[in-house]
């Protein structure tokens, strides 16, 4: 995947990866079962089908980018440093969506909220991060680039 650098809000460089719809991808077996994360369930015979991760994670390949998360402002939303965020640029952002936004020349990932007057606010999801609510004002550079629809993480 081609990668282009972009600046995150703290000045560090994050990677942005574009998905290539014609690229060959490896297939992984998707087993037709649910794995208990609490008490184990009895084993059984399960069917498997082959899928690619992009088939599971990407709804609009031509409008989707992957962005590496930097910082800790979204940990209570389950987004951690180094996570690869699936960002769909065609999904309509709504209040409550987690969005990738360009604000004053920096990219940031925050929870989109509307104040009582319908004005946009971008909320962090970690009160300990030191990042406050962002409230774009008229005349400031601001654009929602897309909605975060999923993520991938390595252990």
Q: Which stretches of residues belong to each language-model region?
A:
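Short, positionally conserved secondary-structure boundary motifs
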Residues: 1-75, 106-107, 119, 137, ...
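Short beta-alpha junctions and helix-cap segments that line functional grooves
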Residues: 95-99, 110
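Short, conserved secondary-structure segments in the cores of folded domains
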Residues: 75-76, 89
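Aromatic- and Lys/Arg-enriched surface recognition patch
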Residues: 103, 108-139
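Structural motif
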Residues: 82-83, 97
